[in-house]
Structure formats: structure tokens, C-alpha cells
Amino acid sequence: MNRPVKGVADKAEKSKVKRKTREELEREARERKRDKKHRGHSAGSRTQEKASTDQNSGQRKVADPRIGSKKPVQLGVLDSAIVKPKPKSKPSEPVEKVVAAKPTMSPEEELAMLENDTRLDALLDRLDSGETLSAKDQSWVDETLDRIDILMEELGIELGDDDEEEQQEDMLQLLKRNNPKDAL
């Protein structure tokens, strides 16, 4: 029994692997780097048709995302093409609108409610301190004060400021009359 020699048979079975040259390695590295840089969608991907949908559906449909409405648009204006809108026909019976009616208050109650309004008091305090209000708040204050004036006129209530001014004028006249410089 002869034994085969290990070294001779192994060399015959194995073929020598060719090593890549430096130039080939550099070229492959450049290609890998270029492929790595270019990621994302390819140029013009919107205009390319999707082949998978065409094959499955059996119908020829263009799935272009740029295409919008399929409605034809008339480019020229013709007299016959102008369509006048028809007025809506009114129902024979008037339809009653269901509106949640606010409970009506007497002018006295409404005036008392407006005078005791905390928001109005706070905004008036801010105005007195010299702050400027936003346009929305200012318009609300103006409307509320106008409503208070209207209610006071309806109820016949006058502001007490006029009486105080008249009393001050009377005091000034009395002081002027008693002034000794005027007597000369």
C-alpha cells in the first residue's frame, strides 16, 4: 500500500489565485466610492411609467402624477357656452330656522350685568394705568361702553358728572364775586 504524497497532490488540485494589481484595486475603490455618493432617486423618476401596474391591471393607464383633472377645459369664450346660473327655487313653505334664542333681559338687568362685568373692569383698569389694549379688546370695550350708554339713555339715567361740574362752576363764580380785586 503505497501512500500518496501529500504535497504533490495538493498543489495540482489548487489553482493559483491571481492577485489584483494596485491599479485594479484603486479603480474598484473609486467605483465603490462613486456608487456610495450617488444615493436617492434617479433623475426623471416622475416621468417614468411604473411597469408593474401596467402589467397587473391589463389596461393601458398612464399614472403620471403631473396630470390633474380629466375635465375638458374650453379655451375660447362662446356666447352659447356661457351658462347663467339658475336662481335656487324657494321652497313653497318657509323653513323655520332653529336658533337658540337668548333669554331676553330687561334693560335694567342688562345694564347691571354689564356694569358688574369683571372683564370690562379689568380692561378699564388697564386703560387707566396707561396700557394699550389689543385691537380686539379695544373694540370690545368700545362696544360694551356704547351699549351701556344706550341702556342708560333708555332708562333715563344721567351721569352724575354734570352735576359736579355745575357745582364747581357755581363755586368759582362765588369766589370771583367776593374777590376784592374785582371791586376796584
Curated annotation (Swiss-Prot):
Recorded superkingdom:
Bacteria
Could you provide one GO biological process annotation from this protein's UniProt record? ribosome biogenesis
InterPro entries the record matches: YihI
Q: Name one Pfam family in it.
A: YihI
List the HAMAP family hit by this protein, alphabetically. Answer: GAP_YihI (MF_01058)
Similarity comment: family membership: Belongs to the YihI family.
- Identification of the protein by name: Der GTPase-activating protein YihI
| Source organism | Pectobacterium atrosepticum (strain SCRI 1043 / ATCC BAA-672) (Erwinia carotovora subsp. atroseptica)
